[in-house]
């Protein structure tokens, strides 16, 4: 009787561990867990890098990128995210594991601005770099998005110039000073070494 109970308990433990591992592999659940933990100010994240070893993150990133109409533009190395496969993802993961992954140089194109004869720079990454960047973006957003101030509108999900203007319209109470200025090609002319 004891023998069968022990076998049953061992079986349940193995099944439980497998279920926990599978749940941890689900990127949506991992991201939700990171979001919940980020609400605790005293919590310190550790081993976030290991999420880059999870193939399911790359498939979710692929799904996010593929929905974008410009995602099939080839990078400087000629690759796109088209033709994604488990083998390609495993190669990326292995290069992450042995720390040999290096981003490829980006390709810079100049595209015309709407209703203007001026052009703006557009940086196009290689397919693998787009994928890795999307995975990192998902992880960082899940950690930092819950703790950002409601007044921050730049480069955030569901935030834009329009949401900033709407907030100003609803909450603006007046000011003593306005400063008007024009920053020409701000990001292009900034010293990136100083910023970083």
Placement of each model-derived feature along the sequence:
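Non-catalytic terminal/accessory segments
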Residues: 1-196
């Amino acid at each position: 009787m004891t023998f069968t109970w022990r076998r049953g308990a061992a079986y349940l433990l193995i099944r439980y561990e497998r279920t926990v591992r599978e749940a941890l592999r689900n990127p949506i659940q991992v991201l939700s867990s990171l979001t919940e933990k980020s609400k605790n100010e005293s919590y310190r994240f550790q081993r976030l890098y290991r999420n880059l070893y999870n193939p399911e993150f790359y498939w979710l990133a692929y799904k996010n990128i593929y929905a974008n109409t410009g995602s099939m533009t080839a990078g400087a190395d000629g690759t796109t995210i088209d033709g994604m496969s488990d083998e390609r993802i495993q190669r990326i993961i292995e290069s992450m594991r042995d720390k040999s992954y290096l981003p490829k140089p980006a390709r810079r194109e100049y595209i015309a601005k709407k209703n203007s004869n001026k052009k703006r720079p557009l940086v196009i990454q290689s397919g693998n770099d787009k994928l890795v960047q999307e995975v990192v973006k998902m992880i960082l957003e899940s950690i930092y998005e819950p703790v950002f101030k409601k007044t921050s509108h730049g480069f955030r999900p569901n935030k834009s110039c329009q949401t900033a203007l709407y907030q100003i319209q609803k909450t603006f109470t007046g000011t003593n000073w306005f400063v008007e200025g024009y920053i020409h090609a701000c990001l292009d002319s900034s010293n990136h070494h100083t910023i970083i």
